[in-house]
Regions:
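Intrinsically disordered, low-complexity segments enriched in small/flexible residues
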Residues: 1-108, 112-119, 248-259
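Short alpha-helical segments and helix-capping/turn motifs at coil-helix boundaries
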Residues: 93-97, 128-132, 167-168, 188
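A structural preference for short, pocket-lining loop segments at secondary-structure junctions
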Residues: 100-114, 129-156
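Flexible beta-alpha connector loops of hexameric P-loop NTPases
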Residues: 116-125, 157-162
Length: 259
């Protein structure tokens, strides 16, 4: 297991560099209606990036994992065209991010679970959001990249979480063979968070990750068997059974293999 780092909001895989402090679009005069409107718009646009809170970002980094936004930054150095679920003052950061990004001059549809919010779980709204991205990729004939880091269905939503998976499954199967879909498995994925991405064209799994219908704790409680997560759903066992197509050393290596 990798050595855990101290709590930090910095990307654990990023190179150290000096950043000059600046305030974007700073207005030195007395703010008027225009400045207030710009400020409100910027707050709405930035809300998904910060809604998780510093503590949840630190928890993600303590597990030696990147946030979904840091993973997108590895795939492209250009600003992603984020596909928001809705607009308005109530817009918040969903547990699923969908976007169109530019990778070496080519448009790519990408989604990523935000584990810092509801452990990346899925509900009906996110299922519909994911299905729309699949359909968009199929219509535009562009590749699809999935960055999976999800605990599965959002239990408090009841059957709504399962409805979301049903819609996403249907949409993904419709574009199968039409456009390539490359799925990356990050973190600890369970339930629908594990079997939906396996429907993709290729699956990449880094070391120290897991995906399976359930984890070791449930196996212990139901079958009375002790088993490690790596032996149950790690890259070693999945690559031997053919579930995982490509293994990688870590998240960054996996994302570079995508490119």
């Amino acid at each position: 297991m990798a050595k855990k780092s101290a709590p930090s909001t910095s990307n654990p895989f990023a190179n150290e560099k000096e950043v000059e402090a600046s305030v974007p679009d700073q207005v030195f005069s007395e703010p008027g209606e225009y400045e207030r409107t710009i400020s409100e718009a910027r707050e709405i646009v930035n809300k998904p990036f910060v809604s998780a809170g510093l503590r949840n970002i630190q928890r993600q980094h303590l597990k030696n994992r990147m946030t979904v936004w840091e993973r997108i930054a590895v795939l492209t150095d250009k600003t992603p065209k984020v596909l928001f679920q809705n607009w308005g003052p109530n817009l918040d950061g969903a547990s699923l991010v969908t976007a169109i990004i530019d990778i070496e001059g080519r448009d790519v549809a990408v989604y990523g679970h935000d584990f810092t919010i509801r452990a990346g779980s899925m509900d009906a709204t996110n299922g519909k959001k994911l299905a729309r991205l699949y359909e968009l990729a199929g219509r535009r004939k562009i590749p699809l990249v999935g960055m999976n880091d999800s605990s599965g269905a959002f239990v408090p939503a009841g059957v709504g979480g399962l409805d979301g998976y049903a819609e996403a499954f249907t949409a993904l199967r419709k574009i199968s063979g039409v456009v390539p879909s490359i799925m990356c498995m990050f973190g600890f994925n369970a339930g629908g968070g594990s079997y939906l991405p396996r429907q993709g064209s290729f699956l990449i799994q880094p070391d120290e990750t897991f995906f399976g219908l359930t984890g070791p704790a449930v196996v212990k409680s139901v079958l009375g068997e002790d088993i490690e997560a790596d032996d149950l759903g790690g890259p070693k066992v999945h690559s031997q059974t053919g579930v995982t197509d490509i293994t990688a050393q870590d998240e960054v290596v996996a994302l570079h293999k995508v490119k």
